[in-house]
Structures are given as C-alpha cells and as structure tokens.
C-alpha cells in the first residue's frame, strides 16, 4: 500500500511544545510505567524461523509487530484489524515503528547499585552516606557486612564487619541481637532511612562551628548534595536499581548476514548477561542455595548491570567474541562517535554534492559555475514539479523518465529552476563563517565547480585539487537567508578585523602593480592628454607605454565637493585604473595615483566600501580583477636564474662574521664568557650577518638600472612579485639569493652553524642535512598543530556559544580604558585602531571643550582623526566585559559588527564569531609554519628607541655611574618619560633593572635615538654602594663550584644548588659589599649591602676586589634564544584561555608596602610585605630558594609589582588588580602571539571570550542567602539571590569574581545538555540528574540538539514572535473566560519583535 495513503489514517501529531527539559533519577515505578512487559528469557530470535522468541529480548508481544499491521502468527493482517490484540500470539496489530519506541524491563532478583552514582567522581552515594568509595565497594561487592542496627551490642552503627567478625558477633551476641546486611540491599536500606532535612540542619550547624580550613569545604560538599536531593524530588534509594529498563529492540538491532550468521548490537550481549545471571539468581533463591553461592551470583549480577551501563568503569572491561570491548549505554553517548556529537550535532544533509574546483575568472562575484549534471541531480524535485506544471509529464514517473533521458526541454526547465535560486558552497575545514557562502549558479559543461578568484581568500581555497561541497537551500526562508545573509557579495569584510577579505591576490596584484608602474625614459615622456580616448589612441600607436610619465586629465573633486577635471602627473596605466573608480567626493584620483601593492589595493577597496557601499564595491572589485588578469597576462612576467642577484659583498661579510665567531670561541676558551653566552653571541652574529646580506641583496634587486639611452631597465621580476605582495616574501628571496641563514633543531633551539649558501649556489651536503632538520619539523608540526588548533576552536565555540546580542543597550556606566600599545618603543597597536567602531563610555572632548563624540555614541572613522589631533592618549569605551545585560550582551557594549561596518544587529551570535575569529588563524598559522623552511627568526629585544622628539624626564631616578662611566638603572620602577613641547606625556618606557641609560634628566631627544640598552641574554646583579667584595656562605663544593674550563684552564665561579646536600642546606649564599672599615656597608634605604645569589648565577668578581656603585657583581644567564614561531604561540594562547598557572609563575605583591626578609623556612625564602595602611597584617610569601628575587630588604613596592619574575598567573592579576587589568593582560598577551605572525584580530573578540570565563562568583560571606561560603555560583544567580535577600530585609552575600579556563567554563554552563555534549558526558549527566536540573534551552547548542531553530539571527526573531503570540493567546483566553459574563473589549496590541 502506498505510504501516502497509510499516512491518511495516522493523525498528524503536533510536535510537543516545551520550554525546558528536566533530567532526574528514574524511580522503579517510573521504569515500570515506561515498560510494555517484563523480559524473562535471554533468547533473541529463533534462528530457523527468524521470528522473535516470546518473552525474549526481541519479543513481539512486548515490543510490537515486525511487519506493519500484521501479527506474528499471521492471523490478523491488514489495516482493518488496527489495534486488535491477537489471542494466539498476543501481538498488537499496529505499525512496526513502535518497535523503536516501546521499552521493556527486567525485574532484578536482588537490588544493584547504579554505577554512575557509585563510581563517577565524586561518588554521589559515598557523599550522601559519608563513606569512602573503598568501603562502599566492599559492601556492594559482598566482602563486608555493615551494621544497620547495633541493638544492645557494643557494635557501632554503620560499622563494617568482614565474614569472620560477623559470624563471631552472631555467636557472641546472638543472631537477632543486631542487624547487619551485605550488598546493595544494605545500602538501599540505609539510603531509604535517611532523614535528609535533619542531616542538613546538623551539617549547617557543624559548618558554622568548625574552625579548620578544610572541614567546612568537605561538609559543604555533602550539604550541597543533600539539598540537591531535597529540592529535586529525587529519593536517595533510587540510586539503587530494582528494575532495569530495556531499550526498544530497533535501537539495538540484530541483522542476519548471509551464511547464517548474525550481526548484533553489543547491547544485546550485555542485556543477555544480565538476564542470564538474574534468572540463575532467582533459581538459586528458590532452591534455597547456600548463602555463599547466592552472594556470588548477586555480585556477578551487580557486575553485569555495571557493564551494561558503563563497561570498563569498574574492574575488567567485558569483551565480545573478538576481544573487542563491548559498547555499553554510556559509550553510546560519549565522545566524537557518541549520540551527541555524531547524530545530534553532526547531522548529514541531503540535496548536496561535491566536486573539484577550478578557477572561473569570467564569473561575477555573486556567481559560481555549477556542472549541468550536478545541477540536474540537485534540483530534481524542482524540475519534476515544473515539468508537471508545464504539462510535459502527467506523473512523477514520467517526469523521472524525461530527466533520465536528458530531453532538451529538461535543460530549458533546469535553466528556469536555477535562475535566482542560490546554492551554498562550502570548503572543509570550515574554520569561520566565511567557509560557507551562497552563490547564484551558472550552468557549465564539464564536471568541476567554477569558483570566483576573489572569494578564494575567504575559503582559503586554491586550485591544486581542492574539493568543495554544494548545498541547495530548499525552503523559501532558506533561499531568502542564503541571498540576504550568505551571498558572497554580502561578505566583503572579514568578521575578525573588519578589513576587506575580497582582496585581489597573486596574478591580479601583479597585473595591477605592473599597470601602475612609472618608469623614466619611456617613449613619449612628458606628453599631455586631454582624455582617455587620446591616451588609448597613443597606446595603440605605440607612441607611449603604460609606464610613461605623462600629464593627463582625470575627474576628481575640489574642496567644496564639486566634480572637476584636473591635470595630474601620472601614467596611462594609472589613468586606466582610475577610470574604474566609482565617482565619490571622498575618493579622489590620488587614491590610485601611486604604485599599487597588495596593501594599497586593500586600502583602496576599504575606502570604496566605506564611502560607496556594497554594490559599488562589488562592481569595482570585479572590474579591477579583470584588469589585473588582463595586464598580468600581457606583461608576461617570468624570472630566470639571473634575476636572483647574489650580492658581491657576500664573501667579505661572511668572512667578517666567521672571524667574529672565532673570536667568541676564543673568549670562551679564555674563560671570559660561558658556553651559553658564547652560543648566544655566535647565533646573534650570524643573525645580523644574515640580515645585512638580505638588505644588500634587496638593495641590489630593487635598484633601478638605466639603459645606455637613459631609459629605465625593466624592474627585476622577482622583486616585482615580492614587493607587490603577489608571491614570495623577503625571507624567501633571502634564501634564494643571499644566504639560507640559521636553522632550528626540532627542539626549537637554533643550530649555531648557519647555512651560508643560498639556493641559487646550492647547498653542501652538510648544509642540506642541517636544513632538512627544520623542514621536517615544519611538516610534523603542521599535522599536530592542526589538531590542536581545531580543539582550541572547539573549546572556544563551546564556551562562547550563548553570547548573543539580546538587548540594544544595557545603559552601563562602566567601561574599560584603551590606550595605544607600545612595545620596545614601537607603536604596535595605535589608539585609533583600538577604539574604532566601539562605543564611547564618556564624552570625548577637544582641548577647548567641544565634544567630539558624546557618551553612548559609536566612534566612527570621521571621529578618529579628530581624537588623534586633540592629542587624547586614553579613551574610556564600553566593553562586553562590563556589559550589564542579564542574558547575552547588549549592542552598545559590543559596538560595530565588523563584517558589515554597521552597529551590530539584535540576535547576532557574537560569541561564535569571536571563537571563530580567534580559532581560525590558529589553524592557518599552524599550517603556515613551514613556509619559511624552518629558517630561524630570532626574536630578542635589547634596546629602546624613542618614537618622538621631546625632553627626557626620569621617574624614580635610581641610577648610578659605574666604573665604565655608564649610567646604570638600579631599581625596578625606573621609567623614562618623553615630554612634548607643550608638556604632554608622549611616551613612557619602563626600563629594566641593569640596563645602561643613554640619556639623562632634561636631555633633548630625537626620533630613533636610543634611550637604553641591555644584554638580552643575562640578568645582572648590581652593587648600590662603593666598597670591596666579600663572600658569604659561598663554600667550594657545597654552594659554589669553581670550574676550570678544560679547554682553557681558566677558573669560573658559579653558584650551585646547595639544598641537594643535607649538610649545606642551611646556607644562604650571598655577596656583601664592605666599606673601608671592613664592616658590611649600609644602603641608603636602610638594610645591609647584602645580595642573595640564586642558583646558576655566575660570579663576575673576586673576593676582596673593589667595586663602584652600578658595577655588575654577578649575572644570571637567561635561556638561549628560542625561535619564536606560533608553534610556541598556539600552546601559549591555549594556556591563557585555559587560565592555567604558568610553570614558573611570577609572584605579585598583593599590597603596597615595605619589604622585609624573614627567617628561611625549609628550602624557601620568606619575604613579607608590611602594608602602608595602619593596622594591616603583613603579607607573607614563601619563595623557593634559587629563584631570583627582584627585591632587597627595605625596598618599597607598589600593589601589583613583581616580586619574582615570570609570567604572572591570570588568577593573581584578577585577585590583586581586578577585572579590567586582567582583561587588558589577557588581551595583550593573546594579541602579542597573533601579532608576531602578522594576524590582526579585533580586541572585542578576545573580550567576549574573557567575559564568558568570568561568569562565576566565589561566595565569601553568604549573608542571608542560601549559598554556602566557598561555593561557586553563577553571576546571575548571585545577583538574583542578593536582590531577593535585600527585598526580604536580609543581608546580601558577598563574593569575588572567579576566572575559569574555557574547558571548565564550558562544563559549568547553565545548560547541562550543552555541557554533556562537550566533554565528560557521564559526569555532567550524573550531576544534572542528582540536582534534577532543568535546561531552559537558551544557548545555541542545546537548541540544535533538541532540533529547534537556534535563538540567534533570524531564529531569535522567530522566538520573540512566538513569545508574543503566546502572550496574546493567553490574553484572548483570559478574556474569553471573562466574556462568558462580560462584553468583549479590544485586545491590546502587544509590540511585535523588531
């Protein structure tokens, strides 16, 4: 019978409308209410008849018929008997589909514990009973008895007795004098008799009275779980099962294979074991078997049920016939292949195809070429309906035949169907939302999809065999969204940074660069032209070339915005390009009247987009693409080996550096420098040599050479490619023609012998071997990093998925302060770029008080110039970090939607966009590590240069002139300030301890002048007073070694770890400076001139030698320069987002005060800070010995200063300096990693993620709320509870914000469905069930999982409309109820969703 007809009889069931999903523990009654019958036999199907056995695991009587509307014995067939139950075989006549829905159950002969509540840490049963897991297992697995009621015996309540003790006690006190049980029955009894409210009261009292640190935490955990049971309506004894539910048979199928064998789901095996053991146990109990046998059987039953629920969680993994572990119910949910990630979040779609891509340069930006064969297949249903409508076919079958035969009318109809019906193209891996875009298909012959060249950057596609998938949006809404939101013409800007992503690359760039070249001495130089027609004529007549310097007329705009034509000094090529520019006041001809490199082209597109809008930009892009391709093809640029020019000075430079390296080797041999210092210096010298050669080569290649007749020779082709940004980088050119340079080992260290040859000369065998090292590392890294980066993206998406724009404005007064980021004197991120597209939090005024941007307005391009001109150094802007929206984020705090250049829309999923923007370059970069073939880039800063002209002021001027006459920085907080002529601070540079200052107070300084320099490879310890050296506790062999370098015979003193030896563990190695009278000198700030020496410091002076203030008395060697490469970067980003404590983290002062050194404690140094405030307790720090402590006794520190160097732990920054400082730190650190690779990401994306990491509060004082001290609660719950408490006249709770890493934050979201689908599924579900959690379906993931539209974008609007509709319905119903008595009143019109 036709399925359509069948469906007529089945009433259409409306999908159940629900607002939330709750999860709790199933009670035995609940399990029985689900069940359609008890399963008594382990049999599955009769292997001869293939019919299910009665009462077996596939029983048709319990689960329903195998064929639609047919009972098992065949007595009742067909629809007319629907609902009849056959008296012979007991099967209900209905659809076989019910075998996917109906459940059964197994009644257990003895209760068993649910393994999730027992073994999933923390053990819920253990917490409730306050017993250890070990004791619980001994009871449950029948090793010990537990006393339930001691009666009058001296036994204790809940005492554990082993078999012997139990029998002995029975003999001693009589059998009925006390009650002791064993197994799950015992635990069930205890759980059933628990008086939860009373226990909770007792615990609260105990917590209030407890004095120790740890006890309340432990008690609070137990109290929390008891309250969870009280509130959720779960009963503790339900954690022990008496009935086991059996899932429907079609979800654990048994399929006959050929050859009489069967393929079966593992669950059937697991269920069979449970049934077998249960039946055996029943028999043994009936037969009154000996206790020991029954007990053994009960233990085996417990193990069987454990394996069914979660195989391998306890004891051995149960394996099938082929030694493969069986997949239990828990495994069905867990992991990438589990139900959540494989089926609920990773559904497959139909109406899709995939094929190889080829370039389609003649396409428009909104088009893609779709092979006819593919289109015919994808649009079949549309073609059938159109054929039917036009009368070509009467039935679907006929239409099918027509399409199969590919009749000519089919192609005409295909054309009609496809017109204006967008398709979506996707290239895997889809790292950000631009990996799927919509295009209008254009039918082409062949089998490859044609892709527009300009969208390649967004897809990260190239044409070396990449494949792409095509998807057809079917419904009208889907087509509409594809056209309005996903069309390639709507995605011109990059969501990560707001720069154009539809940017010409490679050939197009080369063509445009070639067109806009200007050369001296070309024919026709200096001619004048009135219009383009004349120029074209002259070009055709070869009177001029594209590059001739001419005077030509072009349209532009004057100051008043009037269109005028002016004469420019330009070239014909530039005029041709200028013709393509849209006419607009803000886009004068000067935009194109220069040499076009990739960057210039990008700026040009940006200017066009910002001023002329999207449509003009798209047309313009298509035009310049055509021009670029045409001119590149005409130019015929290619290169040969002579284009790679090796500088003549190469042998000389190499010789000089080799001599330097030999000299360092000699110095090492003479014992003047250590091995590490020698290595650093040699590497440094070769690095400089490499740079010098590269510069010489670049100078040679880029130099313009003249012919004999004064005409410019054509520019070097390689230089053109690299300079224009079309292909190749200076690094690659350096390797081709200068020298390959330093290489890195796989461990990341730099090999000190560089590769002197370049690729043109060819490498020697040894050099080749060294270079394979780096290259291989690159390839290995690529594979590993792709996985790491993907995992980072997954965690980011998970933590940020519920950050959605929910309200237009939260009216927050707060914000964060932004200023330019200056690193080593270079402006890395200017103030303009950081505040553009953000909302001002306070009025920005010019010097005379006129408002540039009022508070609450967006800072646009027009304002930025004025802010700059007004000399404003710091701007307070609104940020998502300080947004006060209850759920999600408000539009004002977020600012501009970077991908559109307009204020962000309601419902935009900014969290996911942020996650993609941060994650996408991670993968890109990891895939990009090996492009420079492992050639080492040494990143080490050793000086500060001034960026401004001005006057020098030195803050906290602790300096001294040493023996060499250098000004040495003697303190940690010295800063060099450069003041402008009007006294404004232009820049502040913190100068590190031990640096040599090149300027002093009041000096005038020029741009590019050095302010200070230091040795990047060592950290010095300086003396602050003049005197002679004395050693303290520097004992040869115990705390110091004097190594005589075997190569040189020169002694070198070094501090060694003195704690390794018991005898010397109490030493405190130090150097003292003695004055003339032989006493230890006094420092100005009090305290003695005693300098503690950390492990591995190298002593640079002899005892008794005289020193001057500012001299280096010892130095600590820094680690050798590691190559910096995002390889180090990606783990760093992950470390920051996971908020891990770095290995050797900095110790930060928690208060401002004076430093005191205390008594040493074991092998730690004790430092305390005495705060300046009166009555404040000193704060103690224990610092492992051998760490270099920045401070000396008596120093004054500010809150937040470093005591011990290192990367600070983000938690410390949050605790000491607050949220704004923490955000600034995380943003800067993460940005630094990306900047190093030249990736630009807008700060707001990182802020969104940090906001998600700061959603929890640690309760300090619970006030009159239900919270427990030390508990972590959601910010939202915290605020709501406080409002409630204040309303009831109570005291609000206080708390401190907690920083959670992204994994932890994802697992602690309000939605348990989202958390379960992320990681640790079992743990999340166990906890949610105990708490009876309800998921209100607010985020994106949970809605995808339950199969709804996501509450973002158009889905948000739908959700809003649905809410409004429900409110109206309620009003109407309420009125109807009233109107049975009263007359109708008009319904008030509720505001619809915008």
UniProtKB/Swiss-Prot annotation:
Classification via InterPro entries: DNA-dir_RpoC_beta_prime, DNA-dir_RpoC_beta_prime_bact, RNA_pol_asu, RNA_pol_N, RNA_pol_Rpb1_1, RNA_pol_Rpb1_3, RNA_pol_Rpb1_3_sf, RNA_pol_Rpb1_4
Tell me which residues bind Zn(2+) 1.
Answer: 71, 73, 86, 89
Keywords tagged on the record: DNA-directed RNA polymerase, Magnesium, Metal-binding, Nucleotidyltransferase, Transcription, Transferase, Zinc
Q: Name one GO molecular function term.
A: zinc ion binding
Q: What is any Pfam family matched here?
A: RNA_pol_Rpb1_1
Which EC class does it fall in?
Answer: transferase
Task: Cite the cofactor comment.
Answer: Binds 1 Mg(2+) ion per subunit. Binds 2 Zn(2+) ions per subunit.
Q: What is its EC number?
A: 2.7.7.6
Q: Which cofactor does it need?
A: Mg(2+); Zn(2+)
Reactions it catalyzes: RNA(n) + a ribonucleoside 5'-triphosphate = RNA(n+1) + diphosphate
On whether Methyltransferase is a keyword of this UniProt record, the answer is no
Residues recorded as binding Zn(2+) 2, renumbered to this chain, are: 810, 883, 890, 893
Asked if the record carries the keyword Zinc, the reply is yes
Binding sites annotated in the UniProt record for Mg(2+): 462, 464, 466
CDD domains to which the protein is assigned, alphabetical:
RNAP_beta'_C, RNAP_beta'_N
Q: Name any GO cellular component annotation.
A: DNA-directed RNA polymerase complex
Per the similarity annotation, which family is this?
Belongs to the RNA polymerase beta' chain family.
**Record note on quaternary structure:** The RNAP catalytic core consists of 2 alpha, 1 beta, 1 beta' and 1 omega subunit. When a sigma factor is associated with the core the holoenzyme is formed, which can initiate transcription.
Q: What is this protein called?
A: DNA-directed RNA polymerase subunit beta'
- The UniProt gene name for this protein comes to rpoC
């Amino acid at each position: 019978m036709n399925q359509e007809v069948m469906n007529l009889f089945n009433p259409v069931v409306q999908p159940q409308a629900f607002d939330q999903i709750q999860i709790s523990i199933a009670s035995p009654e609940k399990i029985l209410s689900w069940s359609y019958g008890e399963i008594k036999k382990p049999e599955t199907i009769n292997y001869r008849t293939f019919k299910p056995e009665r009462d077996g695991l596939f029983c048709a009587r319990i689960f329903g018929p195998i064929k639609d509307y047919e009972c098992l014995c065949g007595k009742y067939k067909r629809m007319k008997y629907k609902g009849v139950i056959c008296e012979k075989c007991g099967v209900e006549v209905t659809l076989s589909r019910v075998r996917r829905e109906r459940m059964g159950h197994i009644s257990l002969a003895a209760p068993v514990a649910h393994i999730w509540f027992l073994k999933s840490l923390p053990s819920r049963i253990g917490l409730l009973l306050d017993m250890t897991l070990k004791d619980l297992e001994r009871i449950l697995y029948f090793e010990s008895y537990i006393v339930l009621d001691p009666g009058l015996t001296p036994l204790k309540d809940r005492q554990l007795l082993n078999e012997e003790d139990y029998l002995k006690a029975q003999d001693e006190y009589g059998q009925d004098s006390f009650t002791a049980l064993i197994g799950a029955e015992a635990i069930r009894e205890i759980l059933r008799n628990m008086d939860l409210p009373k226990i909770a009261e007792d615990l609260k009292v105990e917590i209030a009275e407890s004095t120790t640190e740890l006890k309340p935490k432990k008690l609070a955990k137990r109290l929390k779980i008891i309250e969870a049971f009280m509130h959720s309506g779960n009963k503790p004894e339900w954690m022990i099962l008496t009935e086991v539910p059996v899932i429907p048979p079609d979800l654990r199928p048994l399929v006959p294979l050929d050859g009489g064998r069967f393929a079966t789901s593992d669950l059937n095996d697991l269920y069979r074991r449970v049934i077998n053991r249960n039946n055996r146990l029943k028999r043994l109990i009936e037969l009154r078997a000996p206790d020991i046998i029954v007990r053994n059987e009960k233990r085996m039953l417990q193990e069987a049920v454990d394996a069914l629920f979660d195989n391998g969680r306890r004891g051995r993994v149960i394996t099938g016939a082929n030694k493969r572990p069986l997949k239990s119910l828990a495994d069905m949910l867990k992991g990438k292949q589990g139900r959540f990630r494989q089926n609920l979040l990773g559904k497959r779609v139909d109406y899709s195809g995939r094929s190889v891509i080829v370039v389609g340069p003649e396409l428009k930006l909104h088009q893609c070429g779709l092979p006819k064969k593919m289109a015919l297949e994808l649009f079949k249903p549309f073609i059938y309906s159109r054929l039917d409508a036009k009368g070509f076919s009467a039935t679907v079958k006929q239409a099918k035949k027509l399409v199969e035969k590919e009749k000519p009318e089919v192609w005409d109809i295909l054309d009609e169907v496809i017109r204006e019906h967008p398709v979506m193209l996707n290239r895997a891996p889809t790292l950000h939302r631009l990996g799927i875009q919509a295009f209008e298909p254009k039918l082409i012959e062949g089998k490859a999809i044609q892709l527009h060249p300009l969208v390649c950057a967004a897809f990260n596609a190239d044409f070396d065999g990449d494949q792409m998938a095509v998807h057809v949006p079917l419904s009208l809404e889907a087509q509409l969204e594809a056209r309005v939101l996903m069309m390639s013409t709507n995605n011109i800007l990059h969501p990560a940074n707001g720069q154009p992503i539809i940017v010409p690359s490679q050939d197009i760039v080369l063509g445009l660069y070639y067109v806009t070249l200007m050369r001296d001495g070309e024919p026709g130089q200096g001619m004048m032209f009135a219009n383009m027609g004349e120029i074209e004529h002259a070009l055709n007549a070869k009177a001029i070339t594209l590059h001739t310097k001419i005077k030509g007329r072009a349209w532009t705009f004057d100051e008043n915005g009037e269109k005028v034509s002016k004469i420019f000094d330009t070239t014909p090529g530039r005029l041709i390009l200028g013709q393509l520019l849209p006419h607009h006041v803000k886009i004068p001809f000067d935009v194109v009247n220069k040499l076009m490199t990739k960057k210039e082209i990008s700026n040009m597109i940006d200017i066009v987009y910002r001023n002329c809008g999207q449509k003009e930009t798209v047309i313009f892009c298509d035009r310049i693409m055509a021009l670029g391709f045409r001119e590149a093809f005409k130019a015929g640029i290619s290169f040969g080996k002579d284009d790679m020019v090796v500088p003549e000075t190469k042998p000389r430079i190499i010789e000089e550096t080799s001599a330097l390296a030999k000299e360092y080797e000699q110095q090492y041999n003479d014992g003047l420098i250590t091995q590490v210092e020698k290595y650093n210096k040699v590497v440094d010298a070769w690095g400089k040599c490499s740079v010098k050669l590269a510069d010489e080569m670049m100078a040679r290649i880029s130099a313009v050479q003249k012919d004999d007749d004064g005409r410019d020779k054509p520019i070097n082709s390689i230089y053109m490619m690299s300079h224009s940004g079309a292909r190749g980088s200076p690094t690659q050119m350096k390797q081709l023609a200068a020298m390959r340079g330093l290489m890195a080992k796989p461990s990341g260290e730099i090999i000190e012998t560089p590769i002197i040859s370049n690729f043109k000369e060819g490498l020697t065998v040894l050099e080749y071997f060294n270079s394979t090292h780096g290259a291989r590392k690159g390839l290995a890294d690529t594979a590993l990093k792709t996985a790491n980066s993907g995992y980072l993206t997954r965690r980011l998406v998970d933590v940020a998925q519920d950050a959605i724009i929910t309200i237009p404005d939260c009216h927050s007064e707060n914000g964060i302060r932004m200023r330019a980021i200056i690193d080593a004197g270079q402006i890395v991120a200017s103030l303009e770029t950081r505040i553009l597209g953000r909302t001002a939090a306070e009025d920005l005024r010019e010097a005379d008080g006129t408002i540039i941007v009022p508070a609450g307005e967006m800072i646009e391009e027009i304002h930025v110039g004025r802010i700059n001109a007004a000399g404003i150094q710091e701007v307070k802007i609104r940020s998502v970090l300080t947004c006060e929206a209850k759920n999600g984020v408000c539009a004002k705090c977020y600012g501009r939607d970077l991908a559109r250049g307009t204020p962000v829309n309601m419902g935009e999923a900014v969290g996911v966009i942020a996650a993609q923007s941060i994650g996408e370059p991670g993968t890109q970069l990891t895939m990009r590590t090996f492009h420079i073939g492992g050639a080492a880039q040494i990143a080490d800063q050793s000086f500060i240069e001034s960026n401004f002209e001005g006057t020098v002021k030195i803050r906290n001027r602790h300096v001294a002139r040493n023996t060499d006459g250098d000004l040495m920085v003697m303190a940690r907080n010295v800063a060099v300030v450069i003041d402008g002529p009007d006294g404004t601070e232009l820049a502040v540079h913190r100068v590190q301890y031990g640096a040599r200052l090149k300027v002093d107070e009041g000096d005038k300084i020029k741009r590019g002048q050095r302010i200070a320099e230091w040795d990047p490879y060592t950290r010095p310890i300086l003396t602050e007073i003049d005197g002679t050296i004395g050693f303290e506790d520097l004992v040869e062999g115990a705390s110091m070694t004097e190594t005589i370098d075997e190569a040189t015979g020169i002694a070198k003193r070094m501090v060694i770890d003195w704690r390794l030896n018991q005898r010397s563990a109490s030493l405190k190695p130090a150097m003292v400076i003695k004055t003339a009278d032989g006493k230890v000198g006094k420092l100005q700030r009090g305290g003695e001139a005693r300098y503690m020496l950390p492990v591995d410091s190298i002593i640079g002076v002899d005892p008794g030698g005289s020193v001057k203030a500012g001299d280096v008395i010892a130095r600590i060697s820094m680690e050798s320069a590691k190559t910096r490469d995002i390889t180090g970067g990606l783990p760093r980003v992950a470390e920051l987002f996971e908020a891990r404590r770095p290995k050797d983290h900095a110790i930060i002062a928690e208060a401002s005060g004076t430093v005191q050194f205390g008594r040493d404690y074991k092998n730690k140094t004790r430092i305390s800070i005495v705060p300046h405030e009166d009555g404040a307790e000193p704060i103690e720090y224990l610092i492992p010995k051998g760490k270099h402590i920045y401070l000396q006794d008596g120093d004054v520190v500010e809150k937040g200063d470093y005591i011990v160097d290192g990367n600070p732990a983000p938690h410390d920054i949050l605790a000491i300096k607050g949220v704004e400082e923490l955000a600034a730190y995380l943003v800067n650190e993460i940005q630094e990693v990306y900047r190093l690779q030249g990736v630009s990401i807008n700060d707001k994306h990182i802020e969104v993620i940090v906001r998600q990491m700061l959603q929890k509060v640690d309760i300090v004082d619970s006030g009159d709320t239900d919270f427990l001290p030390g508990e972590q609660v959601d910010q939202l719950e915290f605020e709501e509870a406080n409002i409630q408490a204040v309303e009831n006249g109570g005291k609000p709770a206080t708390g401190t914000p907690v920083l959670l890493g992204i994994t932890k934050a994802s697992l602690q979201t309000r939605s348990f469905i989202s958390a379960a689908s992320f990681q640790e599924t079992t743990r999340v579900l166990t906890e949610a069930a105990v708490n009876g959690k309800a998921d209100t379906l607010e985020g994106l993931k949970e809605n995808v999982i339950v199969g709804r539209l996501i509450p973002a974008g158009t889905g948000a609007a739908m959700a809003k409309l649905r809410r409004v509709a429900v409110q109206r319905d309620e009003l109407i119903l309420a009125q109807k109820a009233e109107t049975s008595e009263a007359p109708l009143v008009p319904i008030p019109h509720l505001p619809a969703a915008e």
